[in-house]
């Protein structure tokens, strides 16, 4: 399994790090030029990924990370992926933008079910309600 994500803090960074720790490949799709590491807290991971996977961007080198770039890059994340797994998402989340793009592209969408009322589970629970496959154990995805 290869991980394709946006190198963001939290679940994205953990997924990239986990793939690398397991000897896998991982790819970061940036919302800026490939010469920018954003967020800067992922600098070490960014450099390792350059050697054990890749850093990709539709933005030219020298393009800074701007807020409106991140929703745009999410369609590339889904386009490069065979399937999307949303682990946690608030009701307004970039992960939901990626899931919507995946559905438009005919990709399978998985979501980790969460507790009702948990703000970080609202997006996943909504995706499941709308037809995403509940991923409560790894075998469902694999």
PLM regions: where:
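Glycine-biased, small-residue-rich flexible motifs in mid-sequence functional cores and linkers
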Residues: 1-142
């Amino acid at each position: 399994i290869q991980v394709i994500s946006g190198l963001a803090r939290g679940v994205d960074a953990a997924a990239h790090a986990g793939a690398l720790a397991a000897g896998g490949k991982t790819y970061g799709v940036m919302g800026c030029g490939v010469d920018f590491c954003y967020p800067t807290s992922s600098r070490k991971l960014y450099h390792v990924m350059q050697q054990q996977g890749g850093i990709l961007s539709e933005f030219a080198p020298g393009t800074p990370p701007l807020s409106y770039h991140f929703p745009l890059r999410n369609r590339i994340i889904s386009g490069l992926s065979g399937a999307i797994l949303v682990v946690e998402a608030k009701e307004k989340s970039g992960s939901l933008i990626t899931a919507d793009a995946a559905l438009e592209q005919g990709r399978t969408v998985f979501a980790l079910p969460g507790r009702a009322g948990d703000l970080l589970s609202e997006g996943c629970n909504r995706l499941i309600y709308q037809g995403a496959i509940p991923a409560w154990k790894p075998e469902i995805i694999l």
